[in-house]
A protein has these predicted regions:
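An N-terminal assembly and electron-transfer interface module characteristic of large anaerobic redox
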Residues: 1-148
Length: 148
């Protein structure tokens, strides 16, 4: 299940005390983002807008939509980036999949023991890559992770 870093959003709202916020994210996360948007509005008593236009990542943040709505902060959810902010009011929020890779990692060990591999993932599983690397290395697989 995809888990959005709601604590970070709440901390930012409580610190900055905006009069309105907007949230956007990829199409697959929109139901969760919509629920979060409604909860923010109720919890903080501020307008919280869902920007439901299709977004394609950090190069397509829809900051214009947030500006049109006069949202003081735009939370872009689920597009991992090495930068936490792109504009003063645009904040990147992680969303990770909490699925376990234990079983598949064990099966990979059987095939890969003694070999060197490159380990890659998508942004929703970045939080697990170091654990998988450690598990594989402990079982005799040499693992390389590049920078992306």
């Amino acid at each position: 299940m995809i888990v959005i870093d709601e604590e970070k959003i709440f901390d930012i709202i409580e610190t900055r005390k905006p009069v309105s916020v907007a949230l956007n994210g990829p199409d697959g996360l929109l139901p969760k983002v919509q629920d979060l948007t409604l909860r923010i509005g109720k919890k903080y008593g501020i307008p919280a807008y869902l920007l439901a236009d299709t977004t394609w990542g950090t190069c397509d943040l829809n900051s214009n939509g947030a500006k049109v709505l006069n949202a003081e902060i735009l939370f872009n959810i689920g597009h991992t980036s090495s930068m936490e902010t792109f504009e003063e009011n645009v904040i990147m929020i992680d969303a990770f999949d909490d699925i376990s890779f234990d079983k598949v990692t064990e099966k990979c060990v059987e095939l890969l023991r003694g070999k060197t591999i490159s380990l890659i993932t998508d942004s929703q599983h970045l939080n697990q890559i170091e654990l998988i690397k450690k598990t594989l290395e402990e079982k005799g697989v040499n693992v390389k992770i590049g920078k992306g």
